[in-house]
């Protein structure tokens, strides 16, 4: 299939979803938000004030970059390996900064075992404790899944021994926790995990203040597409909205909505929001506006990094190009699944800044810092 025909088919799919999404109150974008013939910027403006910080240039593989702030310092972790993605030598490393611009590291945070490699599962900050969630995944066969563990620190230097996250019945979580669990105003924490067999994704929640125990699988009926790697946000009407990558190659985001604080969710439905079949992120700004960050190319290309905004949490009618092909450096070294582009963004609001962490070409750990007052 040539590129032009592919874009036409994706555009038809996007437009066909627009009316249905509007009627059913699912997230969507105006049909003219992106200019498909513009393969450089998608017709989007840049964002003044957005600046890039390179945390680490890796000689091998780096991905799943996550940033947080704790105790007056910034912490950034990612998975690292010598050459390829998800190999037995994959470990989690982190770097530390006092100003968010200059970083020390990387420092080993978690090492692989004889039978598992380890990837980041997210930061959880509660009071004077910072917790790093670590996903230990079967090295010989990823379809056998993994398990979520954690380590904690009170000073940013000394870490506890690994302990398993636990389900409500006390069992260890035999699942891979997605990297940006959301704490709701009432104290509940909502996220998603990929459970055995294979990568079966399911929303999860806990009322444990520390978010270390009490995890429960939410009710999540089967729906459209092949959902993976979601992120969630709280809409102004207090509905929880979870956006998913569609591994079935629809090249649009999937969505599920919860009206009971994450206990039950609607079946996944295709949106008209274009995607690159990649991990993305979503969240809520301090003024209540919802946002998502991803690669809305309608193809496998991840060479455009876009931030989209919505006042009501459903119509994303404003978008900015944070980085595009012109900003993309060449890949330095070959490696399995080292996709060119802006990979796996995750975002968090720290103070008056939206921090977007990602991997460039799955080689470099990079941050984009966006002043909230510029949005």
PLM feature segments, named:
Residues 1-7:
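Bacterial N-terminal signal peptides that target proteins for export
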Residues 19-60, 68-116, 124-178, 182-277, ...:
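Beta-rich carbohydrate-recognition and catalytic domains
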Residues 121:
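Charged, often glycine-rich, active-site loop that binds/positions anionic groups
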């Amino acid at each position: 299939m040539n590129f032009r025909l592919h874009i036409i088919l994706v555009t038809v799919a996007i437009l066909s979803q627009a009316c249905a999404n509007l009627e059913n109150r699912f997230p969507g974008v105006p049909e003219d938000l992106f200019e498909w013939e513009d393969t450089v910027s998608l017709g989007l403006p840049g964002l003044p004030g957005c600046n890039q910080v390179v945390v680490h240039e890796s000689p091998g593989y780096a991905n799943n970059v996550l940033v947080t702030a704790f105790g007056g310092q910034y912490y950034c972790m990612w998975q690292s390996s010598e050459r390829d993605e998800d190999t037995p030598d994959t470990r989690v490393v982190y770097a530390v900064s006092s100003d968010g611009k200059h970083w020390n590291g990387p420092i080993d945070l978690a090492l692989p075992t004889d039978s598992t490699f380890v990837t980041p599962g997210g930061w959880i900050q509660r009071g004077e404790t910072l917790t790093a969630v670590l996903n230990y995944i079967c090295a010989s066969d990823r379809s056998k899944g993994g398990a979520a563990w954690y380590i904690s620190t009170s000073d940013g230097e000394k870490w506890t021994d690994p302990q398993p996250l636990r389900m409500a019945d006390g069992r260890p979580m035999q699942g891979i926790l997605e990297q940006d669990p959301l704490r709701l105003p009432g104290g509940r924490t909502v996220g998603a995990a990929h459970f055995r067999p294979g990568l079966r994704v399911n929303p999860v929640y806990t009322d444990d203040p520390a978010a270390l125990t009490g995890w429960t699988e939410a009710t999540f009926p089967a729906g459209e597409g092949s959902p993976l790697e979601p992120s969630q946000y709280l809409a102004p009407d207090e509905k929880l909205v979870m956006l998913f990558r569609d591994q079935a190659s629809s090249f649009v985001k999937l969505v599920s909505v919860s009206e009971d604080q994450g206990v039950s969710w609607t079946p996944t439905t295709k949106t008209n929001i274009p995607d690159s079949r990649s991990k993305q992120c979503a969240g809520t700004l301090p003024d209540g506006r919802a946002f998502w960050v991803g690669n809305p190319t309608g193809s496998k290309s991840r060479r455009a990094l876009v931030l989209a905004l919505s006042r009501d949490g459903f119509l994303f009618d404003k978008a900015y190009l944070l980085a595009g092909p012109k900003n993309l450096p060449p890949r330095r070294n070959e490696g399995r699944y080292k996709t060119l582009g802006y990979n796996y963004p995750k975002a968090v609001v720290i103070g008056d800044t939206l921090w977007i962490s990602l991997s460039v070409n799955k080689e470099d750990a990079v941050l984009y810092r966006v002043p909230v007052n510029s949005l």
